[in-house]
């Protein structure tokens, strides 16, 4: 997820992949496919990142399905049917510009102090939108204690066309941290909807963060008395799994004495201990938590 404006823009499920390129560099692929048939004005999108961006490239839409299938494969195993490029610098801020997008990356404190000026450099001048974004979105992006970087992306009309709607960011993480950008814009309800999958490699397991997130999840409403939402914290030799699932029981068609237990809507975190890869699936769930997941990298 990310902080996106205007809020009426219809986007598909968010897909995130963050992978190590070398000891100093990682690549973040952040996919929010625009579902609106035609953009009539620029879309503003921001998310936290743990270091400065060094390059931005567009990639083919097919990458979305490849990343999603890797994550889905891990969670499908839980659901058993039967169970026992640089454009220039302005104000010391690096900008990357293309015909259909404009990207900059700066510390949160810099963004806060020069917010309108930075957006103007992106040719984003809608005064009402800037004021609303500053009120509802900026507070979730600026962490005064840690002063994380913020990627500012302006997607221009025409970006939604063609086969290259995927943006890839090569960046240099600072402090051996990786930020998985789940935070939303602030709303008045206090509940936040999540529809995102993520694949992150070369990171350490953080059970405390994952437990907090999963315990806060509200799964889709039950329609049968036999349905239960259950919390799992499981570990094996190769994996650690923290997730919630909807379980229910059905009777066998051969006789009422036989019962089948079903597990569906598995949502949470799976960590592969051998490959050091984190898989995240938060599909159509809500939570009172509105935050990023911040992980330590493998040194």
UniProtKB/Swiss-Prot annotation:
The keyword Electron transport does not apply. Keywords: Apoptosis, Early protein, Host-virus interaction, Inhibition of host caspases by virus, Inhibition of host innate immune response by virus, Modulation of host cell apoptosis by virus, Protease inhibitor, Suppressor of RNA silencing, Thiol protease inhibitor, Viral immunoevasion. Functions as an inhibitor of the host RNA interference antiviral response. Inhibits the insect host cell apoptotic response initiated by the viral infection. Blocks as well the activity of members of the caspase family of proteases. Required for late and very late gene expression. Gene3D superfamilies: Baculovirus p35 (2.60.250.10). GO terms for molecular function: cysteine-type endopeptidase inhibitor activity; cysteine-type endopeptidase inhibitor activity involved in apoptotic process. Belongs to the protease inhibitor I50 (p35) family. SUPFAM superfamilies: Baculovirus p35 protein (SSF49894). It comes from the Viruses. The keyword Cell membrane does not apply. It comes from Autographa californica nuclear polyhedrosis virus (AcMNPV). InterPro entries: Baculovirus_p35 (IPR003429), Baculovirus_p35_sf (IPR036562). This is Early 35 kDa protein. One of its GO terms (biological process) is symbiont-mediated suppression of host apoptosis.
């Amino acid at each position: 997820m990310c902080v996106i404006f205007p809020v009426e823009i219809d986007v598909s499920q968010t897909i995130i992949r963050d992978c190590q390129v070398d000891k100093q560099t990682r690549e973040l692929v952040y996919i929010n496919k625009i579902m609106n048939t035609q953009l009539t004005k620029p879309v503003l999108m921001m998310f936290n990142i743990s270091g400065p961006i060094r390059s931005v490239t567009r990639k083919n839409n097919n990458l979305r399905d490849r990343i999603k299938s890797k994550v889905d494969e891990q969670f499908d195993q839980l659901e058993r049917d039967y169970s026992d490029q640089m454009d220039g610098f302005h104000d010391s801020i690096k900008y990357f510009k293309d015909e259909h997008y404009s990207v900059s990356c700066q510390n949160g404190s810099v963004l806060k102090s020069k917010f309108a000026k930075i957006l103007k450099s992106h040719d984003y001048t809608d005064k009402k939108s800037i004021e609303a974004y500053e009120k509802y979105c900026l507070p979730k992006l600026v962490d005064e204690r840690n002063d994380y970087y913020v990627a500012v992306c302006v997607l221009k009309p025409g970006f939604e066309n063609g086969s290259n709607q995927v943006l890839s960011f090569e960046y240099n993480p600072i402090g051996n941290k990786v930020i998985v950008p789940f935070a939303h814009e602030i709303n008045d309800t206090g509940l936040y909807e999540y529809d995102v999958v993520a694949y992150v490699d070369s990171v350490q397991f953080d059970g405390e963060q994952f437990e907090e997130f999963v315990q806060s999840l509200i799964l889709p409403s039950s329609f049968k008395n036999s349905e239960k939402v259950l919390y799992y914290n499981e570990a094996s030799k190769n994996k650690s799994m923290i997730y919630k699932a909807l379980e229910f029981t059905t009777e066998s068609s051969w006789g009422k004495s036989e019962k089948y237990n079903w597990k569906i809507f598995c949502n949470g975190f799976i960590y592969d201990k051998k490959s050091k890869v984190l898989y995240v699936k938060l599909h159509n769930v809500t939570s009172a938590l509105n935050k990023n997941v911040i992980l330590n990298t493998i040194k």
